[in-house]
Swiss-Prot record:
Gene Ontology molecular function: ATP binding; ATP-dependent DNA damage sensor activity; damaged DNA binding; mismatched DNA binding
Pfam families reported in the protein's UniProt record: MutS_I, MutS_II, MutS_III, MutS_IV, MutS_V
Protein name: DNA mismatch repair protein MutS
Family statement: Belongs to the DNA mismatch repair MutS family.
Gene3D superfamilies: 1.10.1420.10, 6.10.140.430, DNA repair protein MutS, domain I (3.40.1170.10), MutS, connector domain (3.30.420.110), P-loop containing nucleotide triphosphate hydrolases (3.40.50.300)
InterPro entries noted in UniProt: DNA_mismatch_repair_MutS (IPR005748), DNA_mismatch_repair_MutS-lik_N (IPR007695), DNA_mismatch_repair_MutS/MSH (IPR017261), DNA_mismatch_repair_MutS_C (IPR000432), DNA_mismatch_repair_MutS_clamp (IPR007861), DNA_mismatch_repair_MutS_core (IPR007696), DNA_mismatch_repair_MutS_N (IPR016151), DNA_mismatch_repair_MutS_sf (IPR036187)
Residues passing through the membrane, by range: none
GO biological process terms held by the UniProt record: mismatch repair
Primary gene name: mutS
Native organism: Escherichia coli O6:K15:H31 (strain 536 / UPEC)
Length: 853
């Protein structure tokens, strides 16, 4: 920070600021001064750039002008949102002392720290996306990873075994803020991510972590959570929890448990697969035309977030899946009645988190009340649904009649945004508050009554009651009648023609009225805090209710989608395989203006690989992706876009579909392609679904063909994975003749002159041609270029109609591992010592090598 070294030379106020800033050197400090939050020195310069606000100077301290920038306190949320979106963290420093009684600067302290991963304010969060704080740890045995959604209390840990799995977890969870140890070795894994925070090693100590977690959950050990034997995950979780406590400056009662996420419990998808399948984000980085955009018609934000978690973590437990299927089927006749009521529930999950953090605002409590008011109707509607899982959700959501009654009595119908604005607590809730409000609102009536009463009592017709800003309330009597003033009248002010008095009753009333607004507001704040105390004992049950409501929203939504989009319930089978009748791509069918051409698929242990050929734009990639998406939907318990589906166990989904240069890492398209291919070949199993599209196209024809052949052979013969293998190498269509479990299918097209019509229908057998020139013409390549290409094609076909095919077969794939026969010239050169040759001997060797070549 650009500050003078001599601390004592600063003004008392700046000394206070500098002490607070020294405690938070790496983040911006919002320092409350009256109606503004001020920033000074380097913070002011940074904020002026980040927020586009004016940079000014505030006098001088220690002889130097102080750079300053400020924002109005009532607009702070908008500015915080901008900073958080840029990955910045902010310490909020408030005035906690009373200016009237303070000697020197008003006492101030940092009351909270706003960071990208620990925000809970509604204005700072995207309502339909999780906002995660994460921590990563690494030792010689692997990684530890923990995530916390502070806006819901959801706390998870895992222990990814290798770099690829860790990268997939980072891509799946996409944390807003990531904590890492100062000696973290795999920086290339996290570099470039938003919200990186370097933390000291001691925060990751295992003993500290266990102590922190036991203290948080009120337990003696962590056995009950199933995380006792996950030391790497616990190291990450301990650091994460400590950071959350440090930033919130309060207890975190809504974080009540921690859950271990195990690799074997869900279908694993690496980063490339999530990207290529466009689950929640399309390839351009947006949310349009994704699987979530089709499936997510949930009516609550918390339901939307839960559905996205399901999509990114499909479960393998068929008991869970069958229960979801049964529930979706049972709910299909009730969606029209349930969704309007569920819509009124709102985002109860995040409201409860703010309640736990004691940052809930009046409108949060009003929304909570509104959610409670929907529960009786919801429960009544669900009573008619013949489904045990639905009835379990109905019981779990509860009714909370007492809490509903409390909030109906306590909070007005439409409260202001902030409790400090007053007028939050309803009339009739607290007698003392009503009195203070009556005093503040009813001073005029009281003074009129007092004036009438005192005139009658004293008989003085010139007596009147009034108010003066300097002297307060008074009773005024004309000079001519002042000698008749009662003995209990104490003179307050003498005027030319009148005397002004005060009586104990009026003085007491004056004190009440002058402080009634302040007293009413202070009492209102106290009563508001007491509401938290009355609600928080029910937090656990309320969180269970919110979870049940979110799950109900997801299941009702999937029931509506199944009915509206004509989906079918898939059947799970024990053996590996996928059989699809009339399958459709869930996203493409929604954006097409013409009917989607449905296609079948049959993969089984006896038919493990399909070699897919056909023209570009013919639908090969769509066919492959729809298979993966149907499998993914089945494994979240959803119905699927097909006439009939039977699907066996799946442990992983891999996609090697399309590629682009990774310029940031210095990797070419071909290198990216080969890296993804290597990951598949190392990690796929017989229970994996593998999509391979155009392997080997980034290098020379023979190199690419050889690699594609070897990869296909490895997947079919050794790994035995369920594989869809799209290619333009027609030589690969010979694979079914050379190995078991491989079949050809193709997507056809009709060519007429210079035009081509894509049939988009999958047929058995290999394609007859690739139609590449017709597609090029369709794309607008100049006619003379197309004409020349046709000539060249005829030349090449006449020269070598089947050259590649004669070179590549199942017995010759050893060319990838066995070097070509070395020429005699090369052998002679390898045995030659050039330093020992005379000029004459060198000349002789040149002639000898010439003869060998």
């Amino acid at each position: 920070m650009s500050t003078p070294e001599n601390f004592d030379a600063h003004t008392p106020m700046m000394q206070q600021y500098l002490k607070l800033k020294a405690q938070h050197p790496e983040i911006l400090l919002f320092y409350r001064m009256g109606d503004f939050y001020e920033l000074f020195y380097d913070d002011a310069k940074r904020a002026s750039q980040l927020l586009d606000i004016s940079l000014t100077k505030r006098g001088a301290s220690a002889g130097e002008p102080i750079p300053m920038a400020g924002i109005p306190y009532h607009a702070v949320e908008n500015y915080l949102a901008k900073l958080v979106n840029q990955g910045e963290s902010v310490a909020i420093c408030e005035q906690i002392g009373d200016p009237a009684t303070s000697k020197g600067p008003v006492e101030r302290k940092v009351v909270r720290i706003v960071t990208p991963g620990t925000i809970s304010d509604e204005a700072l969060l995207q309502e339909r996306q999780d906002n995660l704080l994460a921590a990563i740890w690494q030792d010689s045995k692997g990684f530890g990873y923990a995530t916390l959604d502070i806006s819901s209390g959801r706390f998870r840990l895992s222990e990814p075994a290798d770099r690829e799995t860790m990268a997939a977890e980072l891509q799946r969870t996409n944390p807003a803020e990531l904590l890492y140890a100062e000696d973290f070795a795999e920086m290339s894994l996290i570099e470039g991510r938003r919200g990186l925070r370097r933390r000291p090693l001691w925060e990751f100590e295992i003993d500290t972590a266990r102590q922190q977690l036991n203290l948080q959950f009120g337990t003696r050990d962590l056995v009950g959570f199933g995380v006792e034997n996950a030391p790497r995950g616990l190291c990450a979780a301990g650091c994460l929890l400590q950071y959350a406590k440090d930033t919130q400056r309060t207890t975190l009662p809504h974080i009540r448990s921690i859950t271990m996420e195990r690799q074997q419990d869900s279908i694993i998808m690496d980063a490339a697969t999530r990207r290529n399948l466009e689950i929640t984000q399309n390839l351009a980085g947006g949310a349009e035309n994704t699987l979530a955009s089709v499936l997510d018609c949930t009516v609550t934000p918390m339901g939307s977030r839960m559905l996205k978690r399901w999509l990114h973590m499909p479960v393998r437990d068929t008991r869970v899946l069958l229960e979801r299927q049964q529930t979706i089927g049972a709910l299909q006749d009730f969606t029209a009645e349930l969704q309007p009521v569920l819509r009124q529930v709102g985002d109860l999950e995040r409201i409860l988190a703010r309640l736990a953090l004691r940052t809930a605002r009046p409108r949060d409590l009003a929304r909570m009340r509104h959610a409670f008011q929907q529960l009786p109707e919801l429960r009544a509607q669900l009573e008619n649904v013949d489904s045990a899982p639905v009835q379990a959700l109905r019981e779990k959501m509860g009714e909370f009649a007492e809490l509903r009654d409390l909030l109906e009595r306590a909070i007005i119908d439409t409260p202001p945004v902030l409790v400090r604005d007053g007028g939050v607590i309803a009339s009739g809730y607290n007698e003392e508050l009503d009195e203070w409000r009556a005093l503040a609102d009813g001073a005029t009536d009281y003074l009129e009554r007092l004036e009438v009463r005192e005139r009658e009592r004293t008989g003085l017709d010139t007596l009147k009651v009034g108010f003066n800003a300097v002297h307060g309330y008074y009773i005024q009597i004309s000079r001519g009648q002042s000698h008749l003033a009662p003995i209990n009248y104490m003179r307050r002010q003498t005027l030319k023609n009148a005397e002004r008095y005060i009586i104990p009753e009026l003085k007491e009333y004056e004190d009440k009225v002058l402080t009634s607004k302040g007293k009413a507001l202070a009492l209102e704040k106290q009563l508001y805090e007491e509401l938290f105390d009355l609600l928080l004992p029910h937090l656990e049950a309320l969180q269970q209710s919110a979870s049940a409501l979110a799950e109900l929203d997801v299941l009702v939504n999937l029931a509506e989608r199944a009915y509206t989009l004509n989906y079918t319930c898939p059947t799970f089978i024990d053996k590996p395989g996928i059989r699809i009748t009339e399958g459709r791509h869930p996203v493409v069918e929604q954006v097409l203006n013409e009917p989607f051409i449905a296609n079948p698929l049959n993969l089984s242990p006896q038919r493990r690989m399909l070699i897919i050929t056909g023209p570009n734009m013919g639908g090969k990639s769509t066919y492959m992706r729809q298979t993966a998406l149907i499998a993914l939907m089945a494994y979240i318990g959803s119905y699927v876009p097909a006439q009939k589906v039977e699907i066996g166990p799946i442990d992983r989904i891999f996609t090697r579909v399309g590629a682009a240069d990774d310029l940031a890492s210095g990797r070419s398209t071909f290198m990216v392609e080969m890296t993804e291919t290597a990951n598949i070949l190392h990690n796929a199993t017989e229970y994996s679904l593998v999509l391979m599209d155009e392997i080997g196209r980034g290098t020379s024809t023979y190199d690419g063909l050889s690699l594609a052949w070897a990869c296909a052979e490895n997947l079919a013969n050794k790994i035995k994975a369920l594989t869809l293998f799209a290619t333009h190498y027609f030589e690969l269509t010979q694979l079914p003749e050379k190995m078991e479990g491989v079949a050809n299918v193709h997507l056809d097209a009709l060519e007429h002159g210079d035009t081509i019509a894509f049939m988009h229908s999958v047929q058995d057998g290999a394609a007859s041609k690739s139609y590449g020139l017709a597609v090029a013409a369709l794309a607008g390549v100049p006619k003379e270029v197309i004409k020349r290409a046709r000539q060249k094609l005829r030349e090449l076909e006449s020269i070598s109609p089947n050259a590649a095919a004669t070179q590549v077969d199942g017995t010759q794939m050893s060319l990838l591992s066995v070097p070509e026969e070395t020429s005699p010239a090369v052998e002679a050169l390898e045995n030659l010592d050039p330093d020992s040759l005379t000029p004459r001997q060198a000349l002789e060797w040149i002639y000898r090598l010439k003869s060998l070549v």
